[in-house]
């Protein structure tokens, strides 16, 4: 029986650790041609990990040719030629280091920290194998530039059923995450136009918009979200919003405020709303509020969504729905660009959605995050009136204001020394301001 050491508190997933350990045993000659690997069930029991974790590791070894599968028998080591030792020496000076290594924390309370336990490893692995078996040759051909039609149709059906949106698949563009799609959008909006943004905001979007010398107009928030009076006084031609769960404050924008912003957009032909439907799947009290796109009668809303938040950060698949006016600009200026998401990933996600697995995953994840959300709030209540909790009815994070004789920087620094990662509100603000607010994941 294989005995390898795996670290549960490690940034690398367990299946990847196991895959690398076994691969090392094969390449070092400790496991040789014809050696049989333990059964998935047996190794899982021996290492006290899930069978799906072992299955993913074995699947990766099989995909790379290190092992073969013999029907009704199991996994066996393939013949692997040893790498010439002289060649190995040529690489000894290369440092195996990340360019910008992230420090490891015992407790990560950054707002983009996700619960890995909710990821459906076994189902994702099964669908991957199924797609390779059923569509293998097709997936090696170039796909449609806006993303495979099957995936765009699947997403459109999901949005209709669960967000009340009527979306035309031809208006949808698939891309490797929201960041990439915002870069595309940057080229569709007149370069001289000002883009308004909530302040505080999602700083990755701010960096993208401002990277090409685009003028960005920060707009303050009140208890209902972005202030329309300030927006009306600005010269902005587009506004970036996260109305379902404002990032990072957690404010859920009410219908009245949404309609006011839609009225602003209707005031001029070249005005648009960029709606990032951030964390819309996770609402813990009351009925979900429909996205602005659902009440957009003037074809003014650019709608953005991503699966990186709901499934896993490594699933770099997002989508952007363009109004007809901007779709014409896209086809004129950027239609030559190929889709940045591998076709196999698109195929797996398509089956994941159409098979009902995504819906079940969201329901399971919502229960997990609701439980974590309630436990976090309960734990924070022991601080009494020294803590004010904001944005606690939805999303995967909440904001906490501390009444302490310390600056935000001091709180974050002291937490870091104790192995706790916290993120202060100033990290999300356009312009330098000091707070004692922190964003915490639920």
Language model features: what each stretch is:
Residues 1-129, 140, 335-342, 350-353, ...:
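N-terminal basic, amphipathic alpha-helical segments
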Residues 131-133, 138-269, 281, 287-295, ...:
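Conserved core of the PLP fold type I
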Residues 209, 408-409:
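Acidic, serine/threonine- and proline-rich low-complexity intrinsically disordered segments
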Residues 301-382, 388-392:
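PLP-dependent aminotransferase class I/II
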Residues 200-202, 426-429:
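Short, polar loop motifs at secondary-structure junctions
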């Amino acid at each position: 029986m294989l005995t390898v050491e795996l670290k549960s508190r490690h940034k690398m997933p367990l299946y990847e650790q196991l895959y690398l350990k076994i691969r090392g045993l094969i390449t070092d000659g400790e496991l040789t041609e014809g050696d049989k690997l333990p059964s998935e069930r047996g190794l899982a029991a021996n290492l006290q990990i899930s069978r799906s974790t072992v299955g993913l590791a074995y699947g990766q070894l099989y995909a790379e040719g290190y092992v073969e599968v013999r029907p009704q028998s199991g996994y066996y080591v393939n013949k692997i030629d040893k790498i010439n030792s002289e060649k190995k020496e040529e690489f000894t000076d290369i440092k195996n280091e990340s360019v910008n290594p992230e420090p490891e924390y015992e407790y990560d309370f950054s707002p983009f920290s996700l619960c890995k336990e909710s990821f459906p490893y076994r189902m994702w692995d099964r669908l991957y194998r199924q797609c390779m078996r059923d569509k293998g040759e097709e997936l090696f051909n170039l796909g449609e530039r806006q993303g495979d039609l099957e995936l765009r149709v699947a997403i459109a059906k999901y949005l209709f059923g669960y967000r009340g949106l009527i979306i035309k698949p031809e208006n949808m563009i698939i891309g490797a995450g929201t960041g990439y799609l915002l870069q595309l959008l940057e080229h569709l909006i007149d370069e001289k136009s000002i883009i308004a943004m909530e302040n505080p905001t999602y700083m990755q979007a701010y960096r993208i918009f401002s990277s090409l010398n685009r003028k960005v107009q920060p707009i303050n928030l009140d208890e209902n979200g972005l202030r329309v009076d300030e927006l009306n006084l600005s010269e902005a031609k587009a506004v970036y919003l996260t109305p379902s769960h404002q990032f990072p404050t957690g404010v859920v924008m009410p219908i009245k405020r949404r309609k006011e912003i839609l009225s602003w957009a209707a005031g001029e032909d070249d005005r648009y709303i960029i709606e990032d439907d951030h964390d819309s799947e996770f609402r813990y009290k009351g009925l979900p509020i429909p996205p602005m796109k659902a009440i957009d009668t003037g074809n003014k809303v650019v709608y953005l969504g991503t699966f990186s938040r709901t499934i896993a950060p490594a699933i770099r698949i997002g989508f952007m729905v363009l109004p007809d006016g901007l779709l014409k600009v896209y086809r004129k200026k950027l239609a030559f660009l190929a889709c940045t998401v591998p076709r196999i990933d698109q195929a797996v996600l398509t089956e994941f959605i159409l098979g009902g697995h995504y819906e079940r995953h969201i329901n399971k994840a919502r229960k997990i995050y609701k439980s974590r959300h309630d436990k976090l709030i309960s734990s924070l209540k022991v601080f009494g009136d020294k803590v004010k909790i904001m944005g606690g009815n939805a999303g995967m994070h909440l904001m906490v204001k501390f009444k302490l004789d310390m600056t935000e920087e001091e709180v974050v620094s002291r937490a870091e020394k104790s192995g706790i990662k916290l993120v202060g509100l100033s990290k999300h603000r356009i312009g330098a301001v000091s707070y004692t607010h922190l964003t915490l994941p639920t």
